[in-house]
């Protein structure tokens, strides 16, 4: 503590001016500690335990505790902001992709749409498996429950796609199950499952978050524009429910909570998976647009 805060804590006879300067020095250094990352947060505990030896009065203790709490909360929130800044260009590329533009202006080839929806159903099955593994590795009971519910929800969405769209396409469930994963779909889902099986809980969240978050943001953009094609409009309407918004917000809140406990190296790993699967999100739309097939 003395090495961190210097002479300000050695002073035993504080006058008003010296007290203010000393408190400013302490608060500034606490700010540096908190902004430095989760691995330094144990120093916050040392500071709080040192209040008595530092002879800091009750009012100033309250101020420092308030400041610490606020900074820790802000640090968590800013992590999700950092994440979004990492993928802003990717997200802009998704919004400008001809698949999405074709949805909203009605020009998208229906074969591309059909291909996409089928592959999306196949994706959801593997995504559900990934979420089940996330639940198994969750360090908190509430997260175990949440991801098990999300896994079940993904399977329900797959079933709803069959009931609403696949019947229109004249497809049976066996037709979907016998459809092979397109190259991009196989790569994306294989990556998710590899992370889920081999990485810690925080990295799994980094890998699955873009599917939640980008899909939500894209959905809001699509809903605001609509489509002249009734089939596409019906699909866009699936984005409009408030229930999905609550699901995404819960995962974002979880991300902020996780970030407060991560070391810098762990945050980098989180971001690496987050950016990679965000790229896969763009590739998935592109896969649908091109009706991607194996080249050989």
Enumerate the predicted regions with their spans.
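Basic, amphipathic alpha-helical segments enriched in Lys/Arg and hydrophobic/aromatic residues
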Residues: 1-65
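Structural motif
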Residues: 12-21, 110, 198-205, 269, ...
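Short alpha-helical hairpin
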Residues: 84-108, 127, 252-261
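Alpha-helical bundle segments that constitute or directly flank the non-heme di-iron/ferroxidase center
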Residues: 88-93, 107-137, 157, 206-216, ...
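A non-catalytic, amphipathic alpha-helix used as a structural packing/dimerization or gating element
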Residues: 115-126, 149, 153, 269-276, ...
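Active-site-proximal alpha-helical scaffolds that flank and shape metal-associated catalytic sites
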Residues: 142-246, 275, 279
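Long amphipathic all-alpha helical oligomerization modules
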Residues: 244-274
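Acidic, carboxylate-rich catalytic segments that either coordinate divalent cations
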Residues: 270-296
């Amino acid at each position: 503590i003395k090495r961190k805060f210097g002479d300000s804590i050695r002073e035993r006879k504080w006058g008003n001016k010296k007290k203010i300067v000393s408190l400013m020095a302490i608060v500034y250094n606490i700010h540096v500690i908190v902004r430095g990352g989760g691995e330094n947060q144990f120093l916050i505990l040392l500071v709080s335990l040192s209040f008595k030896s530092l002879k800091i009065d009750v009012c100033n203790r309250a101020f420092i505790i308030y400041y610490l709490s606020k900074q820790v909360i802000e640090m968590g929130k800013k992590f999700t902001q950092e994440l979004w800044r990492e993928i802003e260009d990717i997200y802009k590329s998704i919004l400008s992709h001809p698949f999405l533009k074709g949805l909203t202006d009605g020009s998208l080839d229906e074969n591309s749409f059909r291909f996409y929806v089928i592959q999306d159903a196949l994706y959801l099955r593997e995504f559900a498996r990934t979420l089940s593994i996330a639940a198994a590795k969750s360090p908190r009971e509430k997260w175990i429950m949440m991801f098990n519910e999300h896994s079940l929800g993904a399977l329900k969405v797959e079933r709803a796609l069959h009931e609403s769209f696949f019947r229109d396409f004249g497809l049976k469930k066996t037709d979907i199950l016998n459809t092979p994963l397109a190259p991009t779909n196989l790569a994306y889902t294989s990556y998710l499952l590899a992370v889920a099986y081999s990485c810690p809980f925080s990295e799994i969240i980094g890998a699955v978050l873009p599917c939640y978050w980008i899909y939500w943001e894209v959905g809001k953009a699509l809903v605001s524009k609509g489509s002249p094609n009734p089939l596409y409009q019906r699909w866009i309407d699936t984005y409009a429910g408030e229930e999905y918004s609550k699901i995404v917000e819960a995962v974002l809140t979880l991300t902020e909570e996780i970030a407060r406990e991560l070391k810098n190296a762990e945050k980098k790993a989180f971001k690496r998976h987050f950016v990679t699967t965000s790229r896969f999100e763009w590739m998935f739309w592109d896969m649908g647009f091109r009706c991607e097939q194996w080249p050989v």
